[in-house]
């Protein structure tokens, strides 16, 4: 009986927290996110770590970066990110990471900072974004180093 009550209580708590999550609102202006998601600049070193971590950004699974040639598993599906800082503004990079389909409608790149309107999401990730706002800003800061 105690186990049943404990399980029911845990279920109620988890359901309550899932319902309490607010949809992420992005202030898109001209195919860009001009304002930092955190109000502060990102850390390029932390962004590189997110970029390389398979359970976070996992960017090398699809993209190539010459300066990271010592890393394994460079993908060939997405475009090379060499020189990406010269092709896009900081605000454009922020939107491309947060919600790439707003710019590239046919992309298979996931939205790293959305928590609704997604498909094929595992139950434990429903209502959650892949990256936090700070991690998005960190990746943007790292991408800005790729001239």
Regions found by a protein language model. Name each.
Residues 47, 55-66, 93, 109, ...:
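The canonical Cys-X-X-Cys-His
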Residues 94-95, 102-104, 112-147:
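C-terminal capping alpha-helices of c-type cytochrome domains
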């Amino acid at each position: 009986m105690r186990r049943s009550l404990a399980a029911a209580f845990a279920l109620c708590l988890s359901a309550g927290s899932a319902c309490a999550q607010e949809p992420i609102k992005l202030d898109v202006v001209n195919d860009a996110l001009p304002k930092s998601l955190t109000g502060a600049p990102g850390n390029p070193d932390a962004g590189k770590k997110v970029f390389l971590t398979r359970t976070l950004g996992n960017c090398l699974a699809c993209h190539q970066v010459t300066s990271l040639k010592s890393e394994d598993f460079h993908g060939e599906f997405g475009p090379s990110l060499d020189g990406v800082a010269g092709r896009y503004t900081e605000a454009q990079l922020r939107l491309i990471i947060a919600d790439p389909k707003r710019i590239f409608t046919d992309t298979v790149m996931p939205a790293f900072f959305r928590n609704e309107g997604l498909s094929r999401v595992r139950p434990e990730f429903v209502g959650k974004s892949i990256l936090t706002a700070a991690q998005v800003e960190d990746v943007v800061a790292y991408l800005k180093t790729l001239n």
